Amino acid sequence: MSDALIRLDQVGVTFGGEAVLDSIDLSVAPGQIVTLIGPNGAGKTTLVRAVLGLLKPHRGKVWRKPKLRIGYMPQKIQVDATLPLSVLRFLRLVPGVDRAAALSALQEVGAEQVIDSPIQTISGGEMQRVLLARALLREPQLLVLDEPVQGVDVVGQTELYNLITRLRDRHGCGVLMVSHDLHLVMSATDQVVCLNRHVCCSGHPEQVSGDPAFVELFGKTAPSLAIYHHHHDHSHDLHGSVVAPGTHVHGEHCKHG
């Protein structure tokens, strides 16, 4: 797409003779939320490294909009308990950031109250907001969020997902979000890509959220969950494994008596 912020064309990565990523096509446009899901070992971390420019693919290419500003939120950080590091000092590790800029970013994510707290003492939900604030300091056109709700309770997850949507709306940035849960994805996602070393399925949540078989499978949690159609000659079960012919994951074309 001509208005893409980033585009991967037939990207392949091989480690030790084994394909970690195979023929990956992916793009993110301004204002679009793309959620990448898949089991452990599916290549999600490798793909993120390629998006961030930390890894050069062995095949295919990664195109980025010229002078693209990327804000990256890591899955988590480990800080030595004896290190005297406040949230403010942590945010000021980003070049050019002063207290006013740090406070503004924290206010945007609803975490301004922790600005002077030792970073080791804040809660899991507060830490995720601080990491998100750090990603916003670069005024990014593209946000790359690796497990943004990790270690947060269900209520906190909903609040964080709503916050991410508001940030997208406010800044018009694209969002690439990574999840290690095959089927738990935020309802505001525009596009979901299921990765298992290759792109095995993709789609819009709205395409399946109202399907009877989908609702039957997930019950009351259906609006927050999505199963996507596979475009290959195989399917994956709920754990990401390839299932034998004759079995399937429910989709919108399922007919149940």
From Swiss-Prot:
Residues 6-221 form the ABC transporter domain. It comes from the Bacteria. The keyword ATP-binding applies. It is found in: Cell inner membrane. GO terms for cellular component: plasma membrane. It catalyses: Zn(2+)(out) + ATP(in) + H2O(in) = Zn(2+)(in) + ADP(in) + phosphate(in) + H(+)(in). Keywords: ATP-binding, Cell inner membrane, Cell membrane, Ion transport, Membrane, Nucleotide-binding, Translocase, Transport, Zinc, Zinc transport. GO terms for biological process: response to zinc ion. SMART domains: AAA. ATP binds at residues 38-45. Its main location: membrane. The keyword Nucleotide-binding applies. Its EC number is 7.2.2.20. It is an enzyme of class 7 (translocase). Pfam families: ABC_tran. It is a peripheral membrane protein. Part of the ABC transporter complex ZnuABC involved in zinc import. Responsible for energy coupling to the transport system. PANTHER family: METAL TRANSPORT SYSTEM ATP-BINDING PROTEIN TM_0124-RELATED, ZINC IMPORT ATP-BINDING PROTEIN ZNUC. The complex is composed of two ATP-binding proteins (ZnuC), two transmembrane proteins (ZnuB) and a solute-binding protein (ZnuA). Belongs to the ABC transporter superfamily. Zinc importer (TC 3.A.1.15.5) family. This is Zinc import ATP-binding protein ZnuC. It comes from Pseudomonas putida (strain ATCC 47054 / DSM 6125 / CFBP 8728 / NCIMB 11950 / KT2440).
